[in-house]
C-alpha cells in the first residue's frame, strides 16, 4: 500500500496514539530518528566602526549588525527554500527527499518579531554584555525588547564578535608581555597561564576573576599582572588600587617587594606610619599601587572621585552581599581595568555571583531583579549561567596533580561528640523556646528571635560555661572538650602541630588553657583584636619547626591570607554557615609549601544543630561544584 505525503505525515504524528491503545508499531531505523527541525537563526555582530584592532587582537565595543534567517537541521536555507517550506503547512513535511518538522505559524511569528527587534538593535546598537546574554538566553533586562528565549530560535555570533569571543577563550594567540627573568624563574606554568588570562581579559575591556583554589598563588599572579602594567607605562598617573582584608596588607607589600621590587606599593591605613592619602594630589604618583582595606575603601569618599588605571579586589567574596553599603561603595569605584581574586566566588547562593560580576563587568548578568528571576528558572542545572560567566573566571584546584604534583593528601574526618547530661538539658530548654518563637506571625520578627537562639545552641554544643558566661570550663562538662582532649593528646604524642578555628572569640583563652596542659607548653592565639603588625609575628613564630605546637584562631579574622604549613592537623571546633569559609581556614595549612599529609577534624555534636549545619554545607558544596565544573567545551563561544 502506498501513502501520499500527507497520509504518511498523519500516520507518523499519530504513532503515540496507536501505542497508547496497545498497538505495536514497528518502523525502519530511518524513521525512528527525530526529523530535522526548521529554526530561526539570529546572527549578532559588530560593524567595523564598533571594533578596535590593537596588539592583543580585535575588541568589540557594541553590536549593531543583526540578521535573521532560517536553518534546517543546522543548515542555512535560502529565502526561496524557506518560502517553499512555509507554504506547505505545519507538522511533518516531505522536503528534498526527507521528512522535516515545521511549525510554520510559529516560525513566521518569530521571524517577524526578530526582524523588528533586529532593525531597532541595528539602529540603536546594544552593549556587548547584552549581546553576550542574548547568546546564552541569559538574564533579561535588555535595553531593547527582544523575543523571549525559544527552542525554535538559535543565536550565533558573527565574524567580528566570534573573533573577540575566541580571544576571551584563549583560542587565538594574542600578544602578552614577557615576564621579567625574576618572575619567569619563580612562577609555575599554571601561574604564568593565570597571568596571561588576567592580561588577555582586561586588555579586552572586561573584568577577570582569578578563582584559583586557596594556596595556588593568586597574589603572585596579580603582582605579575600589575608589574606588566607598570612596564607598559599604564601606572604612571594614578596608582592602581588594591582592596584586601586588613590581615593581608603587610603580606601584599612584602610579596610585591619580593617578587617585583621595582613595583612600589604603599598602604592606605591608620596602622601605616606614612599612609597614602588620596586627597594629597602631589603625592599620588609616588607609588605604582596603593593597598587599603574594604572598610577604608568604603568610607573614604575621595576614592570614588578618582579614576584608577586598575583595581584589584583580594578575597573578593567580601562584596558578596549586593545590597550592603560596603558592596555598593566598592562597586562604585572607577577602574579602567578590574580583577577579583577569590578562591570562593560563590559561598552561599548565586546572588553573590551577581555582585562579583557587577563589579567586574557591569550589566553582564542583567539587573539584580532579572538575575534572581533567571536563576530561579535554572531547574536543570547551571549550564546557561556557566556559559555566560566562564570566559571571565579562571579556576584551578590544587588537588589537580598536573598543577601541584607534590602536594600531599588531605583527609577530612568528622569527629563526632555526644552532649553531656548538663548540655542536653540546656539544649532542650533552648529548643522549647525555639518552638514557641516559631508561632510568631511576623516573619521579620520571627527571624530576629530565632537567630539568638541558634547562636546559644552552638554555644551549648561547645561548652555550658560559654552559654552561661562563666569561667568554669571543666572538660568533663562538655562532650566536645572531652573529644578535643583525646584528639590533641594523640597529636601531641606524635609531636605534630595543629591549628584550631572557632567563630567565638570568647572561648579562645579557655581552649588555650586546655591545650597548653595537653601539649605541655603554651601555644598562640590570633583573633580580630590582634594588632595587624603582630599577626605576622605570630605566623613567623608558628612556622618555625621549634615553634609553639598549636595556634587557635578566630575564623573570620584569620581564615584568609595566612600561611601555617607547619600544621599537619586542622581542627574546626564549631561550624560556620558556609563551606567556603571553612575551606579557606583549612587552606591556611593545606597549600603550596605543605609537605605533610593534612588531617582535617570537624567536631560535630550528634543530634544537634551541628548535624543540620553539616548536611547544609554539603548541599552548598555541591552547588558551587556544579556551577564551576566542566571544561572549555562549556564556554560561551562554543
Task: Name these PLM-found stretches.
Residues 1-164:
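Accessory nucleic-acid engagement/destabilization modules that flank
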Residues 166-211:
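Conserved pre-motif I regulatory segment
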Residues 196-204, 219-235, 329, 359-360:
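Walker A/P-loop NTP-binding motif
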Residues 213, 314-315, 573:
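Walker B catalytic acidic pair
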Residues 230, 402-423, 428, 441-562, ...:
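Conserved Helicase C-terminal RecA-like lobe
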Residues 230-324, 372-373, 479, 520-547, ...:
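SF2 helicase/translocase NTPase motor core
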Residues 291-297, 301-305, 328, 364-470, ...:
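Inter-lobe coupling linker of SF2 helicases/translocases
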Residues 320, 325-328, 333-370, 404-432, ...:
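SF2 helicase/translocase ATPase core recognition
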Amino acid at each position: 500500500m502506498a501513502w501520499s505525503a500527507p497520509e504518511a505525515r498523519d500516520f507518523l504524528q499519530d504513532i503515540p496514539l496507536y501505542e497508547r491503545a496497545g498497538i505495536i508499531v514497528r518502523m525502519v531505523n530511518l524513521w525512528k530518528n527525530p526529523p530535522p527541525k526548521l529554526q530561526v537563526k539570529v546572527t549578532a555582530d559588530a560593524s567595523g566602526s564598533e571594533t578596535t584592532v590593537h596588539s592583543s587582537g580585535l575588541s568589540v565595543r557594541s553590536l549593531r549588525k543583526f540578521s535573521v534567517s532560517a536553518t534546517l537541521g543546522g543548515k542555512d536555507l535560502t529565502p526561496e527554500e524557506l518560502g517553499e517550506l512555509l507554504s506547505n503547512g505545519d507538522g511533518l513535511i516531505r522536503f528534498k527527499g526527507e521528512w522535516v518538522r515545521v511549525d510554520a505559524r510559529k516560525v513566521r511569528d518569530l521571524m517577524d518579531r526578530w526582524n523588528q527587534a533586529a532593525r531597532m538593535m541595528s539602529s540603536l546598537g546594544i552593549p556587548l554584555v547584552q549581546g553576550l546574554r542574548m547568546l546564552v538566553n541569559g538574564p533579561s533586562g535588555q535595553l531593547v525588547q527582544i523575543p523571549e528565549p525559544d527552542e525554535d530560535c538559535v543565536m550565533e555570533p558573527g565574524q567580528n564578535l566570534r573573533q573577540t569571543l575566541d580571544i576571551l577563550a584563549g583560542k587565538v594567540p594574542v600578544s602578552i608581555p614577557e615576564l621579567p627573568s625574576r618572575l619567569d624563574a619563580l612562577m609555575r606554568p599554571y601561574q604564568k597561564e593565570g597571568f596571561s588570562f588576567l592580561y588577555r581579559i582586561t586588555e579586552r575591556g572586561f573584568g577577570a576573576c582569578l578563582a584559583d583554589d586557596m594556596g595556588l598563588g593568586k597574589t603572585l599572579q596579580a603582582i605579575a599582572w600589575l608589574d606588566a602594567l607598570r612596564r607598559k607605562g599604564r601606572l604612571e598617573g594614578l596608582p592602581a588600587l588594591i582592596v584586601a582584608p586588613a590581615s593581608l596588607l603587610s603580606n601584599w607589600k612584602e610579596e610585591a617587594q619580593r617578587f617585583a621590587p621595582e613595583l612600589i606599593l604603599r598602604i592606605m591605613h591608620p596602622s601605616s606610619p606614612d599612609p597614602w592619602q588620596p586627597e594629597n594630589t602631589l603625592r599620588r604618583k609616588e607609588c605604582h599601587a596603593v593597598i587599603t582595606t574594604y572598610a577604608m575603601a568604603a568610607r573614604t569618599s575621595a576614592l570614588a572621585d578618582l579614576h584608577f588605571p586598575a583595581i584589584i579586589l583580594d578575597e573578593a567574596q567580601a562584596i558578596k552581599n549586593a545590597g550592603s553599603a560596603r558592596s555598593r561603595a566598592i562597586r562604585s569605584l572607577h577602574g579602567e581595568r578590574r580583577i577579583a581574586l577569590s578562591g570562593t566566588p560563590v559561598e552561599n547562593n548565586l546572588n553573590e555571583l551577581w555582585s562579583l560580576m557587577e563589579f567586574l563587568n557591569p550589566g553582564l548578568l542583567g539587573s539584580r531583579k532579572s538575575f534572581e528571576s533567571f536563576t530561579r528558572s535554572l531547574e536543570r542545572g547551571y549550564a546557561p549561567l556557566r556559559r555566560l560567566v566562564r570566559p571571565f573566571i579562571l579556576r584551578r584546584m590544587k588537588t589537580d596533580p598536573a598543577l601541584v604534583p607534590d602536594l600531599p593528601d588531605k583527609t577530612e574526618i568528622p569527629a563526632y561528640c555526644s552532649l553531656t547530661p548538663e548540655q542536653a538539658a540546656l539544649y532542650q530548654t533552648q529548643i522549647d523556646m525555639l518552638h514557641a518563637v516559631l508561632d510568631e506571625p511576623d516573619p521579620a520578627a520571627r527571624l530576629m528571635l530565632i537567630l539568638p537562639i541558634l547562636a546559644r545552641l552552638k554555644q551549648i554544643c561547645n561548652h555550658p560555661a560559654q552559654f552561661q558566661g562563666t569561667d568554669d570550663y571543666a572538660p568533663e562538662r562538655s562532650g566536645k572538650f572531652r573529644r578535643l582532649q583525646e584528639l590533641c593528646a594523640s597529636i601531641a604524642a606524635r609531636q605534630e602541630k595543629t591549628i584550631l578555628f572557632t567563630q567565638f572569640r570568647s572561648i579562645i583563652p579557655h581552649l588555650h588553657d586546655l591545650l597548653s596542659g595537653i601539649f605541655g607548653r603554651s601555644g598562640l592565639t590570633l583573633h580580630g583584636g590582634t594588632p595587624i603588625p603582630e599577626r605576622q609575628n605570630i605566623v613567623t613564630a608558628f612556622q618555625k619547626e621549634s615553634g609553639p605546637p598549636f595556634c587557635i584562631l578566630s575564623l573570620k579574622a584569620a581564615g584568609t591570607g595566612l600561611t601555617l604549613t607547619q600544621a599537619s592537623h586542622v581542627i574546626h571546633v564549631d561550624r560556620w554557615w558556609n563551606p567556603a569559609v571553612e575551606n579557606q581556614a583549612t587552606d591556611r595549612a593545606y597549600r603550596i609549601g605543605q609537605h605533610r599529609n593534612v588531617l582535617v577534624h570537624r567536631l560535630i555534636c550528634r543530634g544537634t544543630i551541628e548535624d543540620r549545619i553539616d548536611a547544609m554545607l554539603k548541599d552548598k558544596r555541591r552547588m558551587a561544584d556544579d556551577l564551576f565544573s566542566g571544561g572549555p567545551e562549556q564556554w560561551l563561544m562554543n
